[in-house]
Amino acid sequence: IVSYIFSSFKIYDRPHMDEQYRHVYKAAQEMDGVNYHGTVSNDQIREELTKNHIMAYPSVYMETSCISVIEAMSAKCMVVCPNLGALPETCANFAWMYGYEPGPEKHIAVHSHILGRAIESYRKDETEVLLSLQKTYFDTFYNWDMRMNQWNQFLESIKMRIEMEKNDTT
């Protein structure tokens, strides 16, 4: 098992914060079985995801959505994550999801257990079928062209409502 880490505060336009985590990045670079890459382009991440099998995502943030998970699931990666924030809706019942634990030690234990089960089941035929269905779902419902059309329809409906209200008052 090899872990690929793509992480840095540069992506959040806060590169100065990397300094306080330099020891963490250095430890990751020196670990056997870990390939630390820092921040890379979105195109490179999407390419790398197609070469991977599982995304371990032990998030502790109340996400409103998660583009990382969406792109991993579109790349046929199995995702292991907590049921925190909007991750249940984002993952659409495809993730190996577990109940979020606020205590770090308990969270690590639960995440590790579920991740181990996901690794054990990865090569099963039914997993491949589910991952193919997952890819189809995410490529369909998280498609940027479709999202653009939905937003255009939404904004058009607001515009129409404003025009109707304006006509009603005149």
Stretches found by the model and what they are:
Residues 16-43:
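Nucleotide-activated donor-binding/catalytic signature segment of Leloir-type glycosyltransferases, i.e.
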Residues 46, 69-74, 85-89:
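Short alpha-helical segment that forms part of, or immediately flanks, the ligand-binding pocket
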Residues 50-64:
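Acidic donor-binding loop of glycosyltransferase active sites
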Residues 110, 124-165:
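A charged, aromatic-enriched C-terminal amphipathic alpha-helix characteristic of glycosyltransferases
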